[in-house]
């Protein structure tokens, strides 16, 4: 996880943005964009594009990011 956020905080952030449209357990590309821009703006600077970041997060290729995919990505970042 990100060093400054606990797992509970990360789950809360995910749920806040996932609930904006459609499935409350999945982030759409637009929801992910809003989450990253608001909560982790430096990630977009480090990543060349949102498309690349979305592809990296969406491990199963279903066009949405589950909490498990989201959590795995942030755990990897904090190592």
Swiss-Prot record:
Chain positions with Phosphoserine modification: 42, 47
UniProt GO MF annotations: calcium ion binding; transition metal ion binding; vitamin D binding
Protein name: Protein S100-G
Pfam families recorded: EF-hand_1, S_100
Ranges of residues in domain EF-hand: 13-48, 45-79
Native source organism of the sequence: Mus musculus (Mouse)
Sites where the protein binds Ca(2+) 1: 26, 31
A Gene Ontology cellular-component term: apical plasma membrane
UniProt-annotated binding residues for Ca(2+) 2: 58, 60, 62, 64, 69
Keyword Phosphoprotein applies: yes
InterPro entries xref list: EF-hand-dom_pair (IPR011992), EF_Hand_1_Ca_BS (IPR018247), EF_hand_dom (IPR002048), S-100_dom (IPR034325), S100/CaBP7/8-like_CS (IPR001751), S100_Ca-bd_sub (IPR013787)
Keyword set, alphabetical order: Calcium, Metal-binding, Phosphoprotein, Repeat, Vitamin D
